[in-house]
UniProtKB/Swiss-Prot annotation:
Signal peptide region: none
Database matches in InterPro entries: Ribosomal_bL28, Ribosomal_bL28/bL31-like_sf, Ribosomal_bL28_bact-type, Ribosomal_bL28_sf
Short name of any one Pfam family annotated for the protein: Ribosomal_L28
Keyword Nucleotide-binding: no
Transmembrane feature ranges: none
Entry GO CC: ribonucleoprotein complex; ribosome
UniProt-recorded name of the protein: Large ribosomal subunit protein bL28
Organism superkingdom: Bacteria
Annotated source species: Cyanothece sp. (strain PCC 7425 / ATCC 29141)
Protein backbone atom coordinates (compact mmCIF):
# COMPACT_ATOMS: atom_id res chain seq x y z
CA UNK A 1 0.00 0.00 0.00
CA UNK A 2 1.31 3.42 -0.89
CA UNK A 3 2.05 5.95 1.83
CA UNK A 4 -0.78 8.38 1.07
CA UNK A 5 -3.25 9.96 3.48
CA UNK A 6 -6.72 8.65 2.62
CA UNK A 7 -8.49 11.92 3.44
CA UNK A 8 -6.12 14.66 2.33
CA UNK A 9 -4.14 12.82 -0.37
CA UNK A 10 -0.91 14.02 1.21
CA UNK A 11 2.15 12.07 0.01
CA UNK A 12 5.97 12.09 0.22
CA UNK A 13 8.05 15.12 -0.77
CA UNK A 14 11.37 15.10 -2.65
CA UNK A 15 14.06 17.13 -0.91
CA UNK A 16 17.82 17.47 -0.56
CA UNK A 17 19.95 16.39 2.37
CA UNK A 18 22.62 19.10 2.58
CA UNK A 19 25.91 18.26 4.29
CA UNK A 20 28.28 20.66 6.03
CA UNK A 21 30.31 20.98 2.81
CA UNK A 22 27.04 21.73 1.02
CA UNK A 23 26.97 18.51 -1.00
CA UNK A 24 23.38 17.64 -1.86
CA UNK A 25 21.88 14.16 -2.02
CA UNK A 26 18.25 13.50 -2.72
CA UNK A 27 16.08 12.23 0.10
CA UNK A 28 12.40 11.47 0.55
CA UNK A 29 10.42 13.22 3.28
CA UNK A 30 7.69 10.74 4.19
CA UNK A 31 4.31 11.73 5.58
CA UNK A 32 3.63 10.87 9.23
CA UNK A 33 0.84 8.34 8.62
CA UNK A 34 -1.07 6.51 11.33
CA UNK A 35 -3.74 3.80 11.18
CA UNK A 36 -6.73 5.12 13.10
CA UNK A 37 -10.13 3.68 13.99
CA UNK A 38 -12.69 6.49 14.01
CA UNK A 39 -16.31 6.19 15.10
CA UNK A 40 -18.67 7.15 12.27
CA UNK A 41 -21.98 8.19 13.89
CA UNK A 42 -24.01 8.24 10.65
CA UNK A 43 -22.90 4.70 9.74
CA UNK A 44 -23.03 3.56 13.40
CA UNK A 45 -19.71 1.74 13.07
CA UNK A 46 -15.94 2.12 13.25
CA UNK A 47 -14.03 3.20 10.13
CA UNK A 48 -10.33 2.33 9.84
CA UNK A 49 -8.35 4.94 7.91
CA UNK A 50 -4.69 5.69 7.24
CA UNK A 51 -4.35 9.36 8.08
CA UNK A 52 -1.62 11.94 8.36
CA UNK A 53 -1.31 13.56 11.77
CA UNK A 54 -2.32 16.88 10.21
CA UNK A 55 -5.54 15.21 8.99
CA UNK A 56 -6.19 13.91 12.53
CA UNK A 57 -6.10 17.46 13.89
CA UNK A 58 -8.39 18.69 11.11
CA UNK A 59 -10.71 15.74 11.74
CA UNK A 60 -11.19 16.78 15.38
CA UNK A 61 -12.16 20.26 14.18
CA UNK A 62 -14.44 19.42 11.20
CA UNK A 63 -15.80 15.97 12.00
CA UNK A 64 -15.53 12.80 9.95
CA UNK A 65 -18.65 13.15 7.80
CA UNK A 66 -18.00 16.69 6.55
CA UNK A 67 -14.27 16.05 6.05
CA UNK A 68 -14.97 12.92 3.96
CA UNK A 69 -17.59 14.79 1.93
CA UNK A 70 -15.03 17.55 1.17
CA UNK A 71 -12.47 14.95 0.08
CA UNK A 72 -15.07 13.14 -2.05
CA UNK A 73 -14.71 9.85 -0.17
CA UNK A 74 -17.48 7.28 0.33
CA UNK A 75 -17.07 5.98 3.90
CA UNK A 76 -19.20 2.89 3.14
CA UNK A 77 -16.19 1.42 1.30
CA UNK A 78 -14.01 1.44 4.44
Amino acid sequence: MSRVCQLTGKRANNAYAVSHSHRRTKKLQEVNLQWKRIWWPQGKRWVRLRLSTKALKTLEHKGLDSFAREAGIDLNKF
